[in-house]
C-alpha cells in the first residue's frame, strides 16, 4: 500500500496541527479570548465538537489567568490529570498541582461516609487556605460536591474546569456548575471530556501567560 505522508519536521508538527485546526474551523465563531483553549482541546482530542460545547462564564479566562499569577493551586480529580499539567510552567508562579485521590485519609473518609474518594478529596481541598482552580476530568461526584460546598458557602473557587467524561450523572453535574452565577467556570457541555482535556485546558491557560 502506498500512502502519501506530509513531510513535516518534528519541531513543526504541533505548529502544523494548529494550522490544520484553524483551517478546518473556518468561520466558526469563538468567544474572544477563548480561542487558544478551544484549539488546544481540539488538538488534544481531534474532536471539533469542543468548538461548540465548551462553555465559558463571563470573564472566566481573565479571572483564571489572574488567579494563576497570584499563586492559585490546581486541584485535580485524577493522577492522570495531575500528570498532564505543565508543573514547571506553573512553578514559575509559585504554584503546584494537587491530587488527593490516593491519600490515605481520603480513602478512610470515603469509606466511613459511604461516598466516593472524589467527594472526600473535594472536601479536603475545601480546607486549604489557598486560591484554588479545580480541574475535573473524571468524576461527576466531584463536581456535585463542589456545587454543594459552594452553595453552602464553604468554598469559593477561582475557576472550575468541568470536563469529566461518561454517562452516569455527567450531563447533570455539569449543568449544576453552569447554573452558578458567581463562580467562574469552563465546562464541556454534554458527555464528552476526560482527564486529558482537563489537563490541556490548564496548560492552555498557562501558555497564555
Write out the residue ranges for each language-model feature.
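Charged, compositionally biased N-terminal leader segments and the immediate start
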Residues: 1-32
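N-terminal glycine-rich anion-binding loops that anchor highly charged ligand groups
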Residues: 29-43
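Short, basic, glycine/proline-bearing loop/turn elements
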Residues: 44-52, 107-109
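A short, well-structured juxtamembrane/interface segment
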Residues: 52-67
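C-terminal functional extensions of proteins
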Residues: 158, 168-209
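Conserved mixed alpha/beta catalytic, RNA-binding, or beta-rich assembly cores of soluble enzyme
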Residues: 78-152, 157-158, 166, 174
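Buried hydrophobic positions in well-ordered alpha/beta secondary-structure cores of metabolic enzymes
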Residues: 77, 160-162, 201
Amino acid at each position: 500500500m502506498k500512502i502519501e505522508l506530509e513531510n513535516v519536521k518534528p519541531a513543526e508538527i504541533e505548529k502544523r496541527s494548529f494550522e490544520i485546526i484553524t483551517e478546518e474551523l473556518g468561520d466558526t465563531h469563538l468567544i474572544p479570548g477563548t480561542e487558544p483553549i478551544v484549539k488546544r482541546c481540539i488538538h488534544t482530542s481531534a474532536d471539533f465538537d469542543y468548538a461548540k460545547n465548551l462553555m465559558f462564564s463571563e470573564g472566566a479566562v481573565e479571572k483564571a489567568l489572574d488567579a494563576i499569577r497570584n499563586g492559585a493551586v490546581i486541584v485535580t480529580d485524577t493522577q492522570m490529570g495531575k500528570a498532564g499539567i505543565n508543573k514547571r510552567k506553573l512553578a514559575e508562579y509559585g504554584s503546584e498541582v494537587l491530587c488527593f485521590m490516593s491519600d490515605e485519609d481520603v480513602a478512610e473518609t470515603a469509606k466511613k461516609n459511604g461516598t466516593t474518594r472524589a467527594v472526600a478529596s473535594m472536601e479536603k481541598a475545601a480546607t486549604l487556605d489557598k486560591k484554588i482552580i479545580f480541574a475535573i476530568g473524571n468524576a461527576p461526584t466531584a463536581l456535585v460536591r463542589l456545587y454543594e460546598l459552594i452553595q453552602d458557602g464553604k468554598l469559593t473557587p477561582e475557576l472550575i474546569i468541568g470536563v469529566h467524561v461518561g454517562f452516569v450523572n455527567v450531563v447533570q453535574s455539569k449543568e449544576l456548575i453552569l447554573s452558578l452565577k458567581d463562580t467562574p467556570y469552563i465546562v464541556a457541555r454534554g458527555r464528552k471530556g476526560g482527564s486529558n482535556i482537563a489537563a490541556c485546558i490548564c496548560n492552555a491557560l498557562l501558555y497564555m501567560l
